Amino acid sequence: MRTALVTGAGRGIGRAIALRLAKDGFRVIVHYAGNEAAAAEVVGLIGEHAVAVRADLGVPGDVTRLAERVAAETDVLDVLVNNAGIGMSKPLAEETEAAYDRVFAVNVKGLFFLTQQVLPLIPDGGRIVNITSGVARIAFPEGIAYAMTKGAVQVFTLALAKELGPRGITVNNVAPGIIDTDVNAAWLNDPQARAYAAGRHALNRIGRTDEIANVVAFAASPEASFVTGTTIDATGGGNL
């Protein structure tokens, strides 16, 4: 049985990815940062072929502990999905150094070093999928630091795809648009805000978590064997 690690898999997009990969026959390592109950629920839905592991990717030492736990769970990691991340919505003038450091620690540094430390487990022909965002290709002054982190990950993906290409390991980004998640519920529950958000997509609606999971499942599949170093835009035609 193939094994996948999905970070930030307790809720939202990560949860949907974990459930979809399990449906596709993967044993799933469900990473979570703090919500143990949510991660346990995902494991319960998957059954015996899932295990939950906790780590705060922004805390020194936690990435190493996570990588060690993954190595204890499996000798081979067929798919790594770097989904965990935190969002920010502040313009330049209102940003603080502490908040800036935190979002880069989780979204960039944690992702970078987790990938580095589990890479020895990834076999030739393996898959790495990084979840970025549609804001990496537009001007997003409302959340400039967050957008910068997603741009950094996309550059990381390019370099890693070239480095790992000779081993047949593909590395790709999946960039969601505005998705109906519990994190976004606070503002998407406002009808006016929801209509505005939907209008920013060519499809004139908000995306679903399962739609992003479907794209990730493709990127993680044998059918995507000749796709690497690219960003798959899953924004529903956002900001065209």
Predicted regions and their residues:
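Conserved glycine-rich cofactor-binding loop
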Residues: 10-11
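Alpha-helical segment proximal to the catalytic Tyr-Lys
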Residues: 120-121, 162-166, 225
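Short C-terminal tail/terminal secondary-structure segment
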Residues: 138, 217, 228-240
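Substrate-binding pocket helix/loop in short-chain dehydrogenase/reductase
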Residues: 91-92, 96-101, 197
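A conserved structural motif in NAD(P)-dependent oxidoreductases
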Residues: 201-212, 223
